[in-house]
Amino acid sequence: MRKPQLLAAAVEALHDRGFSATRIADVAQRAGTSSPAVLYYFGSKDELLEQALEYADAQAYDAWKRAFETLPRASDKLWFIVESSAYQPTRADDWTLWIEMWARALRRPKVRVHYERLDRRMRLLIAEVIREGQAAGEFGECDADGAALTLSALLDGLGVQRTLDHEDLPPERMVDLCLRWVERELECDLGASEVNYWRERSEGDPSSARA
């Protein structure tokens, strides 16, 4: 039994059952192995959650990087970040595990450190895209790190509402709100009303560039 298989099973179990209701046996059953085999890799449920989130986060991060290779403009990359976050194409991309992590991080310093490291990696990637756009003349001058932090927080907050199926926040509304904030902050025109780009393209090639 390979560790990535166990991590994929852990992501599914935690997504479906939540942290408190998930047992090591649940992960083992989904992975088609034994509880001792799971415990060989994960010494505790906290460690299981941490590594499952890191696995899911790495998948999302790698998907962004692969998509960026096909997107020539920084504005297209920001658009992709926002829309892929709103439409949640796979379980690994949604906020369910993050919500579980936030709850644990409130009272467990070790979990908090782990969360902060993963969150920082995503924010640095967003800041890198913003600086790329500034260098290319696509975006106006601003604090790239501050803008990345704010956009990340906006995505997180609205992402929680999307995860809870808030009736006032369909995915296209989330995209529109985020892109309009980006346009104001970065003094650019992303065409914020074209909110179906990522969803339509993802039915074919999710890495396709916006026309």
Show where each model-derived region lies.
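Hydrophobic/aromatic-rich alpha-helical bundle segments in the mid-to-C-terminal region
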Residues: R112-E116, R120, Q134-D205, R210-A211
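Hydrophobic alpha-helical connector segments
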Residues: Q51, D62-W95, A147-L151, V175, ...
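Amphipathic alpha-helical segments used for helix-helix packing
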Residues: D76-K77, T90-V113
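Short, basic, alpha-helical segments at the C-terminal edge of helix-turn-helix-like DNA-binding modules
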Residues: E54-Q59
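Helix-turn-helix
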Residues: Q5, A9-E47, Q51
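A ubiquitous short alpha-helical element
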Residues: E47-L49, I81-Q88, V113-R120, C142
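Short coil/turn segments at alpha/beta junctions that flank glycine-rich nucleotide-binding fingerprints
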Residues: D16-S20, L71, A136
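Conserved amphipathic alpha-helical interaction elements at protein-protein interfaces in regulatory
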Residues: E12, D16, S44, R66, ...
